């Protein structure tokens, strides 16, 4: 998914009341989204359209260094219209720091209380050209605490074709969240579990009105096994986080360990008044003693609000362009700088990546997006 279709998928999860932050898969998402900057490769252009509340399409073309593209379609029985506010539309695409919600119970009548007569579902398909690679996603809310996501990928190289399928079942009870995965690649099966401590919210509607500053603890683990390759993997992790309540700045502190390879990672991320985000990540290997430190930052430029005093009216007009400056640097010498901005209905990204400790070439890219 690109940024536009991903924004629609996030809107689907938000409007159906699914707490994606309560998954072990997304334990370190707040820091990863800030540090792992995606720099456009060459010159890219996206054209997106939402002709109806339930249907969206996207065309993407890459002109440099090689010519390729893709076309994708998305359909859902959920109203996926993005906010009409200009800055809200921009922030929907560019916000990277994930504001976590407190754990809450899913009531039996949650979906009907939100106005859904049928169980919410979403279908997404993407065709890459000229490789004819096909991607598909099907997501359905089986019940208030259960969610199912099926991902498929079909590729063709000459006369050889391959199809892979990933089944991802999620069950969120508020106090804990269970994930079971199965992939046809290597016949891999995985199990993830996340436990939460702290005050459990009675429902989604009460968690949205949280005013008290209460930090929450989350502890989880995962294990997976590949039957074809006889490969085993495991990891454990913990997270301490707070929620945005209008008084205190939200933060997220995580620590994960892969005991097989001895890889230890700790992260810290915080957001200040939705205008700046600071993030750090420290990696250490218990066996080789190798380490790495990464720092990330986001600075948002807001539109200035000016009152028309000449005619003594209360009309407020906005001037200037929205934008966000992203910066990521590591002790390996990697420096990544990106600027995301909006000009009328166009979103653009300009970025570069430099390795300061070597003579490798500098990467530079431009990405344009238009939606209506």
Curated annotation (Swiss-Prot):
Topology in the lipid bilayer: Multi-pass membrane protein
Homology family: Belongs to the MDM10 family.
Protein name: Mitochondrial distribution and morphology protein 10
Subunit structure: Component of the ER-mitochondria encounter structure (ERMES) or MDM complex, composed of mmm1, mdm10, mdm12 and mdm34. Associates with the mitochondrial outer membrane sorting assembly machinery SAM(core) complex.
UniProt key word Transmembrane: yes
InterPro entries in alphabetical order: Mdm10
Protein keywords: Membrane, Mitochondrion, Mitochondrion outer membrane, Transmembrane, Transmembrane beta strand
Domain notes: Lacks alpha-helical transmembrane segments, suggesting that it resides in the membrane via beta-sheet conformations similar to those predicted for other outer membrane proteins and porin.
């Amino acid at each position: 998914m690109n940024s536009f279709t991903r924004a629609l998928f996030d809107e689907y999860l938000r409007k159906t009341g699914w707490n994606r932050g309560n998954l072990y898969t997304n334990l370190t998402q707040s820091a990863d989204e800030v540090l792992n900057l995606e720099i456009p490769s060459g010159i890219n252009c996206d054209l997106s359209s939402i002709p109806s509340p339930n249907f969206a399409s996207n065309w993407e073309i890459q002109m440099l260094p090689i010519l390729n593209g893709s076309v994708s379609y998305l359909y859902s029985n959920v109203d996926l219209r993005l906010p009409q506010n200009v800055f809200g539309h921009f922030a929907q695409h560019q916000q990277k720091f994930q504001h976590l919600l407190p754990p809450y119970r899913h009531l039996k009548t949650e979906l009907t209380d939100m106005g859904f007569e049928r169980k919410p579902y979403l279908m997404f398909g993407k065709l890459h050209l000229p490789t004819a690679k096909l991607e598909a996603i099907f997501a359905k809310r089986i019940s208030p605490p259960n969610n199912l996501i099926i991902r498929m990928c079909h590729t063709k190289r000459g006369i050889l074709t391959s199809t892979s399928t990933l089944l991802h079942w999620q069950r969120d009870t508020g106090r804990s969240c269970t994930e079971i995965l199965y992939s046809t690649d290597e016949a891999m099966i995985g199990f993830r579990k996340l436990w939460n401590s702290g005050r459990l919210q009675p429902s989604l509607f009460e968690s949205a009105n949280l005013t008290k500053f209460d930090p929450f603890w989350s502890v989880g683990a995962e294990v997976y096994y590949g039957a074809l390759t006889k490969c085993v993997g495991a990891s454990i992790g913990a997270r301490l986080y707070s929620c945005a309540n209008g008084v205190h700045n939200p933060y997220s502190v995580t620590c994960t360990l892969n005991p097989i390879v001895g890889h230890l990672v700790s992260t810290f991320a915080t957001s200040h008044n939705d205008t700046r985000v600071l993030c750090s990540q420290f990696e250490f290997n218990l066996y080789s003693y190798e380490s790495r430190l990464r720092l990330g930052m986001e600075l948002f430029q807001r539109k200035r609000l000016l009152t028309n005093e000449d005619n003594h009216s209360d009309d407020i007009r906005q001037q200037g362009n929205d934008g966000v400056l992203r910066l990521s640097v590591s002790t390996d010498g990697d420096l990544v700088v990106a600027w995301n901005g909006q000009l009328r209905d166009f979103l653009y990204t300009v970025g570069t990546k430099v390795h300061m400790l070597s003579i490798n070439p500098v990467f530079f890219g431009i990405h344009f997006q238009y939606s209506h």
